[in-house]
Amino acid sequence: MADVVVGIQWGDEGKGKIVDRIAKDYDFVVRYQGGHNAGHTIVHKGVKHSLHLMPSGVLYPQCKNIISSAVVVSVKDLCEEISAFEDLENRLFISDRAHVILPYHAKKDAFKEKSQNIGTTKKGIGPCYEDKMARSGIRMGDLLDDKILEERLNAHFKAIEPFKEAYDLGEDYEKDLREYFKTYAPKICPFIKDTTSMLIEANQKGEKILLEGAQGTLLDIDLGTYPFVTSSNTTSASACVSTGLNPKAINEVIGITKAYSTRVGNGPFPSEDTTPMGDHLRTKGAEFGTTTKRPRRCGWLDLVALKYACALNGCTQLALMKLDVLDGISAVKVCVAYERKGERLEAFPSDLKDCTPIYQTFKGWEKSVGVRKSDDLEPNAREYIRFIEKEVGVKIRLISTSPEREDTIFL
C-alpha cells in the first residue's frame, strides 16, 4: 500500500520534515512531480539538509528512494545532490521515463519570464514540460544509449534553430550540450531504472511506499491559481499517474499545512498580511525559499483555500506545521470566508481577483516551541487546532513545534 504526502497550500508547507519524520516506517520514498525548482529543508541532529530533487528518505539507510516519471530532472543539479551523500547504490533510482531539463529550457524560461512575470524560478521547469507535452523531449532512458541520445539531440538542435538568437544560446550550443551530457550522463546512468515496474512489484508484494509531492495544491496547473501556478499537477491524484500505481493502491493522504500561510512569487494571496505582522512571521518562520532564497509573502491561515485543497486531495489526515511561529502573538487571525463585491464566498473560486478576507480572531498563546505532547500545549493553542479540524473536517494527526525532527506531536 502507498501513502501520499501532499502540500495543501502554495508550497513550502514543511513536507520534507514530515517525510523525514515518518520515512523510517517505509520501504520506498518516491518523489512524484516537479523539478529542482522545489526544495525540502530537513534538520537532522542539528545539521540542515536542503534537497531539491532527492526524495526525503535518503537520510534513512533502509529506504529505497525513487525519482518517478513526472519529475523533470536537471542532471547537473542532481549530480551535485548525489555527491553530498554516500552509499546511494541500490538506494536511489531515477525513472527512465522522467524528462531531462536542458540548459536551453532555463534560457527559454528566463526569456519568457521577462514578459509574463509569473514569478517562476527560471530553472527551466515549464519549458521542459512544454517539450514533454509536444513529444519532443529527451528522457532519462535516452541517456543509456548513445545512438538514441544522438538522435534526440539532433532533433532538438533542429527544433530550436529559429530561437537560438532570441534565447541567447551562443554559437557553441551544440558542442556545449554534447559535452554537458558527456560530463554528467556517466554519473547519472547507474541510477536510471524502470521504476514503474519496480513500484508495481513492490505494491504487489505489500511493501510500504511513501509518495512525496513537491510545491502545493494551490500551484496545480489545472486546479491552482492560474496563471500563477507551476507546470505540473501537484495533487495526490498525480502520484498515481507518475508512479504507475493504480488508485486502489493509495491508503492515507496526508495533507501538510502551516499554521499560517505563505506564498513565493506573484499571484493572488487573499490573507496576505502586508503590515509589520507579515514581516514578523517571515523573520520568525525563516520564510525564505530553499531554492531561490526569495523572501516568502506571509499571512494568516486561509481556511477557504484549505478546505478546497483537502477536498481535491481526499486528505485523510493533516499535519500542522510551524505552530511555534505563532507563539507570543496576542491575537491570531484565521480567514474563514472571502468577500467579493459585497458577496460572501465560502467556496474557493477559479479567480481570486477582488477577493478580500473575512477573519475570525483567536486569543494567542505564549509558547509551543519544542512541545512534544498535546497535553503540554496551552489551552488557546489547543482551541486553535480544534477549530481548524472542525472547519476543514479532517483530523490533525501531527503538529510540528520546531524545525527539529523530534519536536513533533503525534495525536
Q: What kind of region is each of these model predictions?
A:
Residues 1-411:
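Non-transmembrane, aqueous-exposed alpha-helical and coiled segments at domain scale
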